[in-house]
Amino acid sequence: MQDAITAILNRYDLTGRYLDKTAVGQLESFFSSGLDRIKIAEIINDQATNILKEAAAQLYEEQPELLRPGGNSYTTRRYAACLRDIEYYLRYASYALVSGSTNILDQRVLNGLKDTYNSLSVPVAPTVRSIQLLQEIIEEELDLQSIKRTDIIQEPFQHLINALSEQDL
């Protein structure tokens, strides 16, 4: 896992350069958003169970066919696996949010996901929708708590959504 600071420093170290205005600006941006990142991570941590329940409820309300015979969440085992995956997306997105880098999402979530989902015949559309729902629910909570930095929350979730949408699962 690599955070935003390490990524910037590594990039400059590899080219043997001192930090220029661009690098300093990136570091300033990361540090200025630090308290908001921590507050958002705390909200996610404190409300993870409710966020997950709400996302699952909305997903299955929108797509009830997933719970019917033949659906990808039909049977207790498949339903539990779906909820577990949604929890993984939330947890790893919170790590990416705090680190200011989507690197962990690539390493721990996205790499190998295509093969896994293909082997299990898991459709990508409900997965993408569940990630969108997680983002929307968190953004609503941030609005209630007067935290305006939605760009911070959008970055990891949009990275997951874009990467999954690009894959031919």
UniProtKB/Swiss-Prot annotation:
The modification N4-methylasparagine is found at N72. Gene3D superfamilies: Phycocyanins. It is a peripheral membrane protein. The keyword Protease does not apply. Contains one covalently linked bilin chromophore. GO terms for cellular component: chloroplast thylakoid membrane; phycobilisome. Keywords: Antenna complex, Bile pigment, Chloroplast, Chromophore, Electron transport, Membrane, Methylation, Photosynthesis, Phycobilisome, Plastid, Thylakoid, Transport. (2R,3E)-phycocyanobilin binds at C82. It is found in: Plastid, Chloroplast thylakoid membrane. The keyword Iron-sulfur does not apply. Coiled coil: none annotated. One of its GO terms (biological process) is photosynthesis. NCBIfam families: apcB. PANTHER family: ALLOPHYCOCYANIN BETA CHAIN, PHYCOBILISOME 32.1 KDA LINKER POLYPEPTIDE, PHYCOCYANIN-ASSOCIATED, ROD 2-RELATED. Belongs to the phycobiliprotein family. Light-harvesting photosynthetic bile pigment-protein from the phycobiliprotein complex. Allophycocyanin has a maximum absorption at approximately 650 nanometers. Heterodimer of an alpha and a beta chain. This is Allophycocyanin subunit beta-18. The gene is apcF.
